Amino acid sequence: MNHNTLSSNWYQDKEIFELEKKYIFSKSWHLLGSINQVPNKGDYVVKTINHQPIILTRDNDNTLNTFYNVCQHRGCILLEHQGNSKQIKCGYHGWTYELSGDLRTARGFDKELIDSKKYQLKPIKHYIWMDQIFIKFNDDDNDLKKILKKIEKIIEPLNFSEYKYRKRDTYKIKCNWKVYMDNYLEGFHIPLVHPKLNTVINYKSYKTQTFDDFSMQWCFLNPDSSPYKNSKDNNKAFYFTIYPNILFNIAPGRLQTNTIEPIDEQNCNVIFDYYFEDVSEKKIKEDILFSEEVQNEDIYICEKVQKGLKSDGFNQGIFSEKYEIGVSHFQLYISEKINNG
């Protein structure tokens, strides 16, 4: 275990941030969303990941596709937000594409002079697990499938393919993305920062376990105060982190996925997607309100930490071997990726 934290410059230095983009985010799997976000033919949704604009579509053959959200004529961004359409049309010069990514029309050009294969939308590799869609910008292999298999084994018999997508919330937070990750990776702060959450979970049962490229926190829930559907055999909460920035928050009847998207060295977006099993509308609203309360408490503390890291009065801290092994494990992962290139 690392006993000392990363020094404060790791949370402020633009050069380190650029190295993270190059050596970590460009080589990692990223969570794009769920197939439930594009349930119908013609549906599309967009997202920016590692400063790259992405489209997810369900085409007329009912096939899921992932592309760069960029017109191949002059590089204009094609789509915004989400919607349903029979084609993708560039608002700059009018080139159109099929939802499969194939070039449909090239306004201003003779059809026989355009190589339609060359100018189709650029595809991105993707992988689907329990209806969750992961993408990767390069073809290097890594252990995502092994990680997901381990998670699947731990949480069985849960199957998120049976859960329904409800909503997405995006929070812009004034902190380095690692500040948010560090905060997520320990429950040490819960009694002080999250008083209501502390009554929902059984804090004495809280445990952390680390693996190669992911970690798990889990605890029992207090049945008298938990807002979740649970039984004697199903009263646990799990918090999985797939490095560098994919989070699964699992409670009985509910899945939240979070992705932490760096904006720059001192700001990040946190994207929450909510999925529910067969629970009542009342329970869904209670869960969302409760989650928003916890998130706002985390935002407050993370932004305070970012301000403190700028101080001349702090450079490097120390980890608790009992409560902060997840943070230590993550920071070791980050430093090794950067230092080894």
Which residues are covered by each model-predicted region?
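Non-catalytic accessory segments flanking enzyme active sites
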Residues: W10-I49, I54
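Short, solvent-exposed coil/turn linker segments
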Residues: S7-N9, E20, G33-S34, D115, ...
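Rieske [2Fe-2S] iron-sulfur-binding domain
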Residues: V38-D139, K145-K153
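C-terminal catalytic domain of Rieske-type non-heme iron oxygenases
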Residues: T57, T63, N69, Y127-I128, ...
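Generic structural signal for secondary-structure transition and capping sites
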Residues: F25-W29, C76, H189
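Short, contiguous pre-domain boundary segments
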Residues: M1-W10, S161
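Short Pro/Gly-enriched beta-strand edge/turn motifs at strand-loop
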Residues: K27-P39, A106-F109, Y239-P244
